[in-house]
């Protein structure tokens, strides 16, 4: 390959600001960010690939809205891509997104507008009811990871996402952030030997030291037992994916 790049697919409220900080600290002005229209899918990845090619001096890229794609699309152009992706307990991710977006008083995208005008339960219900907003609160990780096999029409999203998980050279876990940084450093140093992945926390809504069970209890008390059950049901596939990544970290993959 003529070129190796790092691409942070910045999944909202999955420690992405910390990852961007690390990339910028390592690469300075060779780290770039940009956002895209999520749909149509093929137009999105066309624009993402064009961006990568046009930013010929850049080494590290980051975007909330770049869709995941088959790496061979870049390899044909002589570019090797190392995707950087983090996953998180799906219910906690949605809860963090809600509290973060409530504070965005000058932003008028759907998420912040909804969050500022309703409680957490209402936030979930409204986003579920709006076409192309529902993925934000229902199987978000599966939706995003399945993009790697977007063209496989005979496969279910969870099946695609689990295959993507196996193909990715790196997958981070917010709940194991320090271990994730070690793994990221090992992965990137194969191509950039001086790379350092320091452990930092930014845009934190709740204490990172709060036990997961305690955070889930807070959410359950906030929305009630019945709605919490619904939250779990509409994120059932995301839970399967998250638990798979948890197991990978337990096994020291």
UniProtKB/Swiss-Prot annotation:
InterPro entries: P-loop_NTPase, Sulfotransferase. One of its GO terms (cellular component) is membrane. Residues 1-15 form the signal peptide. It comes from Archaeoglobus fulgidus (strain ATCC 49558 / DSM 4304 / JCM 9628 / NBRC 100126 / VC-16). Keywords: Signal. GO terms for molecular function: sulfotransferase activity. The keyword Ligase does not apply. It comes from the Archaea. This is Uncharacterized protein AF_0307.
């Amino acid at each position: 390959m003529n070129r190796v790049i790092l691409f942070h697919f910045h999944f909202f409220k999955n420690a992405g600001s910390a990852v961007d900080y690390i990339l910028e600290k390592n690469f300075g002005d060779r780290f770039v960010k940009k956002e895209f229209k999520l749909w149509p899918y093929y137009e999105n990845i066309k624009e993402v690939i064009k961006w990568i090619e046009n930013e010929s001096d850049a080494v590290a890229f980051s975007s909330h809205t770049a869709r995941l794609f088959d790496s061979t699309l870049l390899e044909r152009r002589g570019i090797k891509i190392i995707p950087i992706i983090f996953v998180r307990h799906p219910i906690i991710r949605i809860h963090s997104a809600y509290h973060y977006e409530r504070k965005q008083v000058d932003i008028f995208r759907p998420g912040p507008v909804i969050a500022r005008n309703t409680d957490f339960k209402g936030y979930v219900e409204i986003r579920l009811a709006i076409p192309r907003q529902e993925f934000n609160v229902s199987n978000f990780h599966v939706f995003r990871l399945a993009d790697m096999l977007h063209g496989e029409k005979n496969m279910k999203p969870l099946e695609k996402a689990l295959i993507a998980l196996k193909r990715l050279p790196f997958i981070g876990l917010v709940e194991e952030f320090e271990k994730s940084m070690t793994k990221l450093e090992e992965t990137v140093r194969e191509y950039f030997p001086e790379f350092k992945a320091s452990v930092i926390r930014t845009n934190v809504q709740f204490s990172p030291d709060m036990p997961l069970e305690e955070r889930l209890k807070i959410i359950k008390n906030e929305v009630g037992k019945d709605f919490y059950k619904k939250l779990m049901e509409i994120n059932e596939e995301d839970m399967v994916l998250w638990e798979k990544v948890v197991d990978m970290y337990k096994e020291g993959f």
